[in-house]
């Protein structure tokens, strides 16, 4: 029995991935698997540029609105869910189309997961207490002592990754850098064709990001974040959901830590930094075909034709 096929459409934020995916859906019987760590959360629609109800009615979407903002999702769970969905979609006679820009998830899918321990709620609570008492800098200095290699590649204000690295060390007695260095070879259980939208005109991408951020504000983004604060009292600025680009900046604004113009500036800047990181990942990712979304249009047409050839349409 032939193994399933899946077509991945990658790209930075605000480059037109959703629009191109819908064009592919006009020519192939696809079902879309979201490769976006922000779209998993319910109630976070505007700030994540979540596909509209009409778009989701036009073509089935998966891994959207599957948890609440106080719950957590991981690369390991994505790999499990995505692999299962590829099999289920193929069994229905449809074409799995993976669309998004969360490159950490894509790397886990294609290169495998490291044998790291699951999160430990008690240990994480202890680390949070240490952070509250002594500051994040204390945790970072601790990490520098027990795992200098990981500390060197992390920013001193990256609370989530610093705590995770310490958690791994305390649970296993070995630094995360050692675990990452022992990753075993990985074989995909499906045939994957990887395409990407990579804009040559970065100024155009930056303009798109700013325009989309202002559109989100017009659509009620601040009200959306206010609603999250009311509905989920347990949410904080350090919650994974609120660390999503735009939400952290809105949270700080609503906390009175910044004024509105500064919030907008920071939100746009953070989104541009996200796009830069995504493009850096893409440069290191083996790609079967690439298109410039801001070219004359023939480039994206080639991706559509590539998808058709791959699925034998």
Swiss-Prot record:
MF annotations from Gene Ontology: ATP binding; tRNA dimethylallyltransferase activity
Interaction with substrate tRNA, as annotated region: 36-39, 160-164, 243-248
GO biological process: tRNA modification
List of residues binding ATP: 11-18
Keywords attached to this entry: ATP-binding, Magnesium, Nucleotide-binding, Transferase, tRNA processing
Cofactor names: Mg(2+)
Record carries keyword Transferase: yes
EC number: 2.5.1.75
Annotated site (Interaction with substrate tRNA): 102, 124
UniProt: substrate binding residues: 13-18
Reaction(s) catalysed (UniProt annotation): adenosine(37) in tRNA + dimethylallyl diphosphate = N(6)-dimethylallyladenosine(37) in tRNA + diphosphate
Cited InterPro entries: Dimethylallyltransferase, IPT, P-loop_NTPase
Gene3D superfamilies reported for this sequence: 1.10.20.140, P-loop containing nucleotide triphosphate hydrolases
SUPFAM superfamilies: P-loop containing nucleoside triphosphate hydrolases (SSF52540)
Family in the record: Belongs to the IPP transferase family.
Purpose of the protein: Catalyzes the transfer of a dimethylallyl group onto the adenine at position 37 in tRNAs that read codons beginning with uridine, leading to the formation of N6-(dimethylallyl)adenosine (i(6)A).
Subunit structure: Monomer.
Name used for this protein in its record: tRNA dimethylallyltransferase
Naturally occurring in which organism (per UniProt): Neisseria meningitidis serogroup C (strain 053442)
